[in-house]
UniProtKB/Swiss-Prot annotation:
It comes from the Bacteria. Residues 1188-1413 are annotated as: Thioesterase. Modular protein that contains an aryl carrier protein (ArCP) domain which bears a phosphopantetheinyl arm to attach the activated salicylic acid, a condensation/cyclization domain involved in the formation of the oxazoline ring, an adenylation domain which activates the serine or threonine residue into an aminoacyl-AMP ester, a peptidyl carrier protein (PCP) domain which bears a phosphopantetheinyl arm to attach the activated serine or threonine, and a terminal thioesterase domain which assists in the transfer of intermediates from MbtB to ACP1 in MbtD. Residues 5-78, 1057-1135 form the Carrier domain. The gene is mbtB. Pathway: Siderophore biosynthesis; mycobactin biosynthesis. NCBIfam families: AA-adenyl-dom. InterPro entries: AA_adenyl_dom (IPR010071), AB_hydrolase_fold (IPR029058), ACP-like_sf (IPR036736), AMP-bd_C (IPR025110), AMP-bd_C_sf (IPR045851), AMP-binding_CS (IPR020845), AMP-dep_synth/lig_dom (IPR000873), ANL_N_sf (IPR042099). Involved in the initial steps of the mycobactin biosynthetic pathway. Putatively couples activated salicylic acid with serine or threonine and cyclizes this precursor to the hydroxyphenyloxazoline ring system present in this class of siderophores. The lineage of its organism: Bacteria, Bacillati, Actinomycetota, Actinomycetes, Mycobacteriales. This is Phenyloxazoline synthase MbtB. GO terms for biological process: amino acid activation for nonribosomal peptide biosynthetic process; secondary metabolite biosynthetic process. It comes from Mycobacterium bovis (strain ATCC BAA-935 / AF2122/97). The keyword Chaperone does not apply.
């Protein structure tokens, strides 16, 4: 054991070196974080020590950051003290010009440059402009030439196979530098030219070069140096080295000589892993356990499709001056928080505030130079790795708590950093079956020194413009030391994010940093809202709109109108039209009857029965009598209706129509009897607007219906807003489609009658017939509709020219598609159209948005917005944390004000959960997901209960539906997850263009949503099913889609077997690299959905280039093709001679299926061991020298060659395999046919020393199963062990005789073969082929026709029956009959396919059979 004191001194020296201080300045017991040691440098120590076999991890070091604790940990744990890096001996210089591997981050950037990559088509590069004076072009050129000689990576070339090479230096050739002389150009032209240079260079992809210098000479001896570096060749630390060396060389000073190269460094890393294997394995296992639970990257508000088209970045920056930096870092260290984590936490905070979740995945690049040589820190190259942080700020209400959470996330991840973040991402992609990116990055360069050393700024000037970008990155936040302070930068992919989002986020982060630097209180106090003041003001103005509250109840307006215009029409219905006076009389009769039956003010009256015009009088009478109405329609199941009656605390019941079948436990009146009685005088008493008006029962998430209690004044706020907004009056006629159970009926009745208009009632017989609605509109010249979106969709389908009278159409209750407004404008040009938002709990509606120009709605609208709150209402969009969401951030919509319900009847707990207090007001939590636009408009984005998990991602089904509906030719869509516990996404789509197909929809959708949001199944329907309440019937959609998928026999992507030799070869290469069985990879399966990633794609391309002699194939081709079928087509299209490629593929497959012994035998046939124990027509495929073998028996007419691929698949599973050849075919064509199955079995049994290969597993297909059975009987009688018989697509022995004779005439034999489907019909038209085939088939048929076996004949071996589920000759019952012929175990398996299912499932069958051998 190393003495702790000695260990302490060594550790202190290393820490002092990292901190740039004297060792004696560090006290052994001092907290090193307080001394300036940050997380990045602590990780450097961990990496350095772990490479020397010292078992330490970041979390342990971070928990006790003192030299004293660390020395005890190291000395006690390992007995090994850290040592200095040894001086190099033989450098082992590699040859310049030889290819060498890309580093992991290099590879990621190389792949990301390709256009076919998600968020790709972008070079990782850093561009800087230095504004200085008198920079000399010739001196700069000379310095750059020497710089390129010093750092070979400035000459690097990236090769198509995913490697890199450094060509020899070009002798005396100068480094190219472009010089633009603008010294004598007008100032406005100078500015224009400089802007053009910046625009061209700041986002270019350097073509064949990785480092570019340009110099602009400006008036007054000013200069601007333009420096562009491809980050694939050099990381940020290397950039500093490059500029420092360039400045020194420009000044005539020679930097220290280098005795090591980046190429040697990479080769050393590749040749010998620098971390002990147990460490790597442990860290990989640690991440593997967490893969299923890892969160998504931050879901920030983006423009639809924006990230697919934008390739430029913009920068936001803020400089923290030295005083602010010192104050911020001192306060952080006092809390045990490193400066880097303080800045990371401020960034994480804004991500949480503007993201869909406070838990997310954050990408953290690390600068990691392994000390393999003393000169490593002077090299230029890519030394970066990455960490993925699982950041969870849930419940972290203070800055200190957030910083601790982020620091703990870093400690946890850094403690297992031997498995890098890029590998974790690839594993996560494989787990989810889709490419997962981490496009939000936080890069800390604290502790690495100033961004530009003083020598650089002295020689070249002040950096005036800096921009960086990287492939597959949307937001890269960086913190770096600059000019004595800290520079906080955001490089953001331009045009991707919603307007104003990035500016608001960046401002919030900077404000938080300044607040934390200013005082200690800011660390521990609850953080202020992220809502910018300007956004808060907009919302406050809209929430503050008021209108004079009504002092009347819902029915008061009707009775006033009845007095003012008694003869005006009030109701048009199939049961009879009513004037206001007639309707008043009916309502009074109802009120009087209820009072006579014992109704007291506030009692609840159930209204049961079908929808009729008389129901209008019923509800008016109930309200006039002081009651509360509770409707129950005829569609309610009896049990549910009775539960509603019990839960609803009903006092009386009023039945409309015939007596109902529901058991009503309260006094009941028949409406027909009430209206038929003598007119009754009833004068309504004074109304109370605060009293309850109605109780509507809606479905509950638990399955128990919940009764929403709504008071008169709440509903009146909606009614009066409606009347004011649409200027409704006595001339208006309303189509009353909604049943009383639907809250839309409140407006249909009370808004119409309060304004003096008339109601056109859609009765029970008409309410599911949109053509009847159109007739009513046309007949009665209806002017106003209050509809669900589904109803309007159905109406517009049949409306024709019958809707022109409409002038006010309000649609709400579900997604309001923009196309509804456009279609309505065509059929009713004078109609005003408004979308509304709300719920039964918000007294029908709470918000409104009127469409002003339906023909020119923005194409990216997913729906008509919810709009703005009604007067006297207020809205909030609330995050999970309870905070207000900033603009464009989705959260739960809360509604407050006059227009909300009182609660749920008899459900105080539910009422308390959904109606909450905040800021002195009661708010209803709608469960709707909404977001604010910059002008205060609310947009509905879905339902919280419609969020699902797909491939590990949280997905809003409404977003998928909205994207589908934006596609050309798509009329309507509904998305769902198929039932059964899967995460298979499916969609039902209605199209109005016959050219639109399910596949074209999926392809177009890829331009709008990420891969995991593209439905695996798209089914075209004539109409999307709706519920009676006008909402999408999601249960019915799910059932339809599930039935369609079940009908097609596939819940996943359809498996397609290879059709050509080339496709089989490509499948073999892809399957091997993915680590999958061959038959688990179909030719139409997406490589990346199967778990492929950029690294594996590179390996596939390398394999194809090498094994199939296709040097033109590039990795970009793999990303473009994605499937084996497309890849085969691409390769064939590039070949002048496609047959050559097929031949090469066949050779590859032959070799790939050979064992080492086969290869050696082929290379040296003299050494191939003879097989004297077997007849030459017993085909042997050597798989192992272990006991046990499989013996394959072909089908009738089948040759041994037909089972070559099965044999090779068995060999691939390390199984010795034999295939027998029957007489009358191939190399036994001259051998006489066997007279019987028994004789054939005996001949085969005597063909070899089978006891030497036992135990045997027999496999027979069709007739071969019968031959195998007789072979097994012979073997068991002669003491040769048989483990199992696999009977494939064959009759059981005892059933053969009853099947009758098989055909013997040539024509009938050929017809039978066509029916079985095992032979290409084209071949059967070839006379030569038929002459070879038919004699063999007829011989086998004759033997089989004479076969008979009693049902009690058994073998001891297990029998496994296997068949195809679509085999019309051998049914499941026939296969089951094999069970009677074994005294051992019996199993039955089915594969998708017909009689010759085996051709598509070779590998799966081989795995099953081979598992039986051992």
């Amino acid at each position: 054991m190393v003495h702790a004191t000695a260990c302490s001194e060594i550790i202190r020296a290393e820490v002092a070196e990292l901190l740039g201080v004297r060792a004696d300045a560090l006290h052994p017991g001092a907290n090193l974080v307080g001394q300036g040691l940050d997380s990045i440098r602590m990780m450097s120590l961990v990496g350095r020590w772990r490479r020397k076999g010292i078992a330490v991890d970041f979390a342990t070091l971070a928990a006790t950051p003192t030299i004293e604790a660390w020395s005890q940990l190291v000395s006690a744990g390992t007995g090994v003290a850290p040592t200095a890096v040894a001086a190099p001996g033989d450098a082992g210089l590699s040859q310049e010009g030889e290819p060498f591997p890309l580093a992991p981050m290099q590879h990621a950037m190389w792949v990301g440059r390709h256009d076919h990559q998600q968020l790709g088509g972008v070079a990782g590069h850093l561009y800087v402009e230095f504004d200085g004076a008198r920079v000399d072009p010739d001196r700069l050129r000379a310095a750059a030439t020497r710089l390129a000689l010093r750092h070979p990576m400035l000459r690097v070339q990236f090769l198509p196979d995913g490697t890199q090479r450094i060509p020899p230096a070009a002798g005396s050739r100068d480094f190219p530098i472009s010089v633009a002389d603008l010294r004598h150009v007008a100032p406005d032209v100078v500015d224009q030219r400089l802007a053009g240079i910046r625009d061209a260079k700041s986002h270019q992809q350097l073509d064949g070069a990785v480092f570019e210098l340009a110099l602009t000479l400006l008036p007054g001896e000013r200069t601007r140096l333009h420096v562009d570096l491809d980050m694939q060749a050099a990381d940020a630390m290397s950039y500093r080295i490059l500029l420092a060396d360039l400045a020194a060389l420009y000044d005539g000073r020679e930097p220290p000589a280098l005795g090591y190269t980046y190429q040697e460094y990479r080769q050393a890393i590749e040749a010998e892993e620098t971390l002990p294997q147990p460490v790597r394995d442990a860290d990989r296992d640690w991440w593997a356990q967490r893969i299923p639970q890892l969160p998504d990257p931050p879901a920030l508000p983006t423009r639809a499709g924006g990230e697919r088209d934008r390739r430029r970045s913009t920068r936001r920056w803020h400089w923290l001056d030295p005083q602010t930096r010192d104050a911020l870092f001192a306060r952080a260290r006092a809390r045990g928080i490193t400066p880097a984590m303080t800045l990371a936490a401020a960034f994480a905070n804004v991500l949480a505030r503007w993201s869909a979740s406070s838990r997310f995945l954050l990408n953290l690049p690390l600068f990691s130079r392994q000390a393999l040589h003393p000169d490593v820190d002077l090299l230029v190259g890519d030394f970066t790795s990455s960490l993925l942080l699982d950041v969870d700020l849930t419940g972290a209400r203070t800055a200190a708590a957030r910083a601790q959470a982020v620091q703990e996330a870093l400690r946890s991840a850094a403690g297992h950093s031997a498995y890098p973040g890029l590998s974790v991402l690839r594993d996560l992609s494989r787990h989810r079956g889709t490419q997962v990116l981490a496009p939000v990055v936080f890069t800390s360069a604290l502790g690495l020194g100033d961004l530009f050393c003083p020598d650089v700024t002295e020689q070249f000037g002040t950096p005036g413009w800096i921009i960086s970008q990287g492939p597959q990155v949307l937001l890269d936040a960086q913190v770096t030391e600059f000019d004595g302070g800290v520079l906080v930068n955001w490089d953001v992919r331009e045009g991707v994010f919603a307007p104003g989002v990035i500016d608001a986020m960046f401002t919030h982060q900077v404000d938080e940093l300044l607040r934390l630097a200013a005082g200690d209180d800011a660390w521990d106090a609850p953080s202020p809202s992220a809502l910018p003041a300007a956004q808060r003001a907009v919302r406050a103005a809209l929430n503050g709109r008021t209108a004079a509250p009504s002092t009347e109840a819902l029915h008061d307006g009707f009775f006033r109108q009845a007095q003012q215009q008694p003869d005006a029409p009030a109701v048009f219905a199939s049961s009879g039209d009513l004037s206001y006076a007639q309707l008043r009389d009916q309502a009074s009769a109802v009120a009087a009857a209820l009072r006579a039956a014992g109704l007291r003010v506030g009692d609840t009256v159930a209204v049961l029965g079908p929808k009729t015009g008389e129901q209008v009088a019923a509800v008016l009478g109930i309200l006039a009598a002081g009651g509360v109405y509770l409707p129950i329609g005829v569609d309610q199941p009896r049990d549910r209706a009775e539960r509603i009656l019990a839960t609803g605390s009903v006092n009386l019941a009023l039945v409309c129509g015939p007596p109902c079948q529901v058991r009503v436990p309260v006094p009941t009146l028949l409406l027909a009897d009430v209206l038929a009685a003598a007119p009754a005088e009833f004068v309504p008493g004074p109304s109370d607007p605060t009293a309850l008006a109605y109780v509507l029962f809606t479905s509950g998430s638990t399955g128990e219906p919940k009764g929403v209690e709504v008071a008169h004044d709440a509903a009146m706020n909606t009614v009066e807003t409606f009347i004011r907004h649409f200027e409704l009056g006595a001339a208006d006629r309303w189509l009353a489609l909604a049943t009383l159970e639907c809250d839309m009926s409140v407006l249909d009745i009370f808004a119409a009658l309060r304004s003096g208009g008339a109601i056109v009632v859609v009765d029970e017989a008409q309410r599911r017939d949109p053509d009847a609605w159109a007739r009513l509109i046309d007949t009665y010249e209806v002017t106003a509709l209050n509809f669900m979106p589904g109803w309007l969709d159905m109406l517009l389908e049949v409306g024709g020219g019958r809707l022109s009278s409409l002038r006010a159409v309000a649609v709400g209750g579900d997604w309001v598609r923009p196309d509804l407004a456009r279609r309505l404008q065509v059929q009713a040009p004078s109609a005003r159209f408004a979308g509304l938002g709300g719920a039964t709990e918000t007294a029908v509606h709470a918000t409104i948005f009127e469409v002003q120009d339906a023909a020119n709605l923005p194409p990216d609208w997913a729906s008509v917005p919810y709009g703005v709150p009604f007067p006297n209402n207020a809205c909030r969009v609330v995050a999970d944390s309870g905070d207000d969401c900033p603009d464009w951030v989705a959260g739960e919509l809360w509604v407050s004000g006059r227009g909300i319900a009182r609660g749920y009847r008899g459900r105080p707990e539910l009422t308390a959960e959904r109606f909450v207090e905040h800021d002195g007001r009661t708010w209803y939590r709608t469960g709707d997901l909404a977001r604010y636009w910059h002008d205060g408009t609310l947009e509905f984005v879905g339902r919280a209960d419609h969020r699902v998990k797909i491939s590990g991602y949280r997905v809003e089904l409404g977003e998928i539906e909205a994207a589908l509906q934006r596609l050309p030719g798509v009329h309507a869509a509904a998305a769902t997850v198929l039932p059964g516990g899967s995460d298979v996404l499916a969609a039902a789509v209605c199209v109005d263009d016959a050219g639109v197909t399910a596949e074209s929809i999926r392809q177009q959708l890829a331009d709008l949503v990420p891969a995991h949001m593209i439905p695996r199944h798209v089914t075209l329907l004539d109409r999307i099913p709706f519920t009676d309440s006008g909402k999408i019937d999601r249960a019915e959609v799910g059932a339809l889609l599930a039935a369609e998928v079940e009908r097609s026999g596939d819940r996943s992507a359809p498996y397609a077997a290879p059709r050509t030799v080339l496709q089989r070869a490509l499948r073999r290469i892809v399957a091997d690299i993915l680590g999958r069985a061959n038959d688990a990879v179909g030719v139409h399966d997406d490589f990346f959905a199967l778990g492929g990633d950029s690294v594996l794609a590179t390996q596939v391309v390398a394999g194809i280039r090498r094994w199939l002699d296709s040097p033109s194939l590039m990795v970009a081709d793999m990303f473009a093709a994605r499937t084996i079928a497309a890849l085969a087509q691409l390769l064939t299209g590039r070949e002048a001679n496609a047959d050559r490629l097929e031949l090469v593929a066949e050779v590859y497959l032959e070799i790939a299926n050979m064992t080492s012994a086969d290869v050696m035998a082929a290379l040296d046939p003299i050494e191939q061991p003879a097989q004297p124990a077997f007849k030459p027509w017993v085909k042997r495929f050597t798989g192992t020298d272990k006991p046990g073998a499989v013996l394959v028996f072909p089908h009738a007419g089948g040759a041994a060659a037909a089972y070559r691929w099965l044999a090779k698949s068995l060999v691939a599973n390390d199984v010795d395999t034999f295939v027998v050849q029957y007489p009358q075919r191939a190399d036994r064509r001259s051998h006489p046919a066997a007279d019987s199955i028994e004789a054939l079995a005996l001949e085969l049994f005597e063909a070899g020393d089978w006891h030497l290969t036992a135990p045997l597993t027999l496999f027979g297909h069709c007739m071969g199963a019968i031959v195998a059975f007789e072979f097994a009987r012979l073997a068991e009688r002669n003491g040769v062990p048989v483990r199992a018989l696999w009977a494939s697509s064959g009759q059981a022995p005892s059933t053969v005789a009853a099947s009758g004779p098989l055909p013997t005439a040539d024509r009938d034999v050929l017809a039978d073969m066509v029916d079985l489907g095992g032979t290409d019909p084209v071949l059967l038209e070839d006379e030569e082929f038929v002459e070879l085939l038919v004699p063999a088939v007829k011989a086998d048929y004759r033997a089989l026709s004479g076969y008979s076996c009693p049902p009690d004949v058994r073998i001891r071996a297990n029998i496994h029956a296997v068949g195809g589920n679509r085999d019309h000759r051998i049914s499941r019952e026939m296969l089951t009959s094999w069970e009677t012929h074994t005294s051992g175990r019996f199993t039955l398996s089915h594969f998708d396919g017909g009689h010759f299912y085996l051709n598509d499932h070779l590998d799966a069958v081989a795995r099953m059979v081979s598992a039986d051998v051992r």
